[in-house]
């Protein structure tokens, strides 16, 4: 790709953007963001960026609707500043769980997100561990779908590699993700057979042997923490000696941090795809940074190299 690179952070992911900037050895560009009394947002980019390749870091965390509007306004500002390309770094893709019509008369909001990002003027999206990989098909621009699984897998090997472990998929749709971790640990897998009900989490059975093993539950998102804690309870009842919960994205909504800290889970492992404020940090939480893989992805895009090793 021709053109000099410029890295921006809007509001949501300044710590992660700083780590990416440190890896790339470039400064973060200054962006002035004003919020008016009625909630409107105004953005001003405080340097000339004409002809550059812009990389914008913004996850859809906390107030997802506010974060999305900030991003769209930022993309419009970049386009009107005559940049060469606009590349969105969205570690956590909001609305990804609304990827299909589960009931009649429901929207497919993950597709609407794609439409908005493209129509605003983005040329590329780099994201991490989408809730549903087929969301890539909602876009007509290039999508680089990276994964934190190798980083989490390396941590698990270092800390639990000598243990008798089993990797657990929290439901049938999570088997592929669990298999990737299991292959790195050379471990068997088990599956929690859940009965889907609105606003409920009922586990019917455990498929596989967990007795006497350290059970590592691998998911993509920890939201309220209910799914993780109910998984831990049933696995311990079935004879697991310890339960470790892993997820790329830690939304930590409501009282999730208190629920997880007071649960029977030994450790919660996640990435910094979402910046958790100090009040949502807790003793059992381990955070692994994805700044390096995102930095490598930007280098690859900038230098027209394959990103396959990062998938």
UniProtKB/Swiss-Prot annotation:
Keywords: ATP-binding, Cytoplasm, Kinase, Magnesium, Metal-binding, Nucleotide biosynthesis, Nucleotide-binding, Transferase. It holds the Pfam family Pribosyltran_N. The keyword Membrane does not apply. Binds 2 Mg(2+) ions per subunit. Its cofactor is Mg(2+). Its EC number is 2.7.6.1. Involved in the biosynthesis of the central metabolite phospho-alpha-D-ribosyl-1-pyrophosphate (PRPP) via the transfer of pyrophosphoryl group from ATP to 1-hydroxyl of ribose-5-phosphate (Rib-5-P). This is Putative ribose-phosphate pyrophosphokinase 2. The gene is prs2.
